[in-house]
Amino acid sequence: YKVDEDLQGAGGIQSRGYFFFRPRN
């Protein structure tokens, strides 16, 4: 699980990225 890749991908942000990085959008 790479942060950079998920950060760019909406799917990663909504699933796991959300916990690590709360999207401002």
Curated annotation (Swiss-Prot):
GO MF term (any one): hormone activity
Record InterPro entries: Neuromedin-U_amidation-site, NMU_C
One Gene Ontology cellular component: extracellular region
Subcellular location: Secreted
GO biological process annotation, one example: regulation of smooth muscle contraction
Residues recorded as bearing Asparagine amide in the entry: N25
The keyword Secreted belongs to this UniProt entry's keyword annotation: yes
Keywords: Amidation, Hormone, Secreted
Keyword Transferase among record annotations: no
Pfam families the record matches: NMU
Main location: secreted
Domain of life: Eukaryota
Function: Stimulates uterine smooth muscle contraction and causes selective vasoconstriction.
Similarity field: Belongs to the NmU family.
Protein name in UniProt: Neuromedin-U-25
Gene (UniProt): NMU
